[in-house]
Amino acid sequence: CYFQNCPRGGKRALSDTELRQCLPCGPGGQGRCFGPSICCADALGCFVGTAEALRCQEENYLPSPCQSGQKPCGSGGRCAANGVCCNDESCVIEPECREEFHRPVRAGDRSNVTQLDGPAGALLLRLMQLAGAPEPQPAAPGGY
């Protein structure tokens, strides 16, 4: 089970030293489960509710508690990927999780960045810009 959702007095009563890493998940088993539908990998980011996270449902049936991530963050979460904090239910952008994942990028490293080159990358960049942009003001009548 995931440490955050284990029953009190049962698995959750065990000390932190008895926690194991949650199941591996994602492409090539590079990630770790953070919740029943959340799989995060340092170099790939987090997959929420996707096929990459399906294996994470198995964790609910395992008898011993697990915990992924190193540094605590947010509301009962742990740093899961560069700038991302996850608990067993959701993930949020968390600046304090950025420093933990700084590593040099090598030419042979595979990451989502290379998969988003071209039109897909341009679309994602535009969506991110729109999400961070202030609400547009209505145009004045007749003034274009």
From Swiss-Prot:
Localization: Secreted
Principal place of residence: secreted
Positions carrying Glycine amide: 9
GO BP, one annotated term: vasoconstriction
Membrane-spanning ranges: none
Function: Neurophysin 2 specifically binds vasopressin. Vasopressin has a direct antidiuretic action on the kidney, it also causes vasoconstriction of the peripheral vessels. Acts by binding to vasopressin receptors (V1bR/AVPR1B, V1aR/AVPR1A, and V2R/AVPR2).
Protein name: Vasopressin-neurophysin 2-copeptin
Organism per entry: Cavia porcellus (Guinea pig)
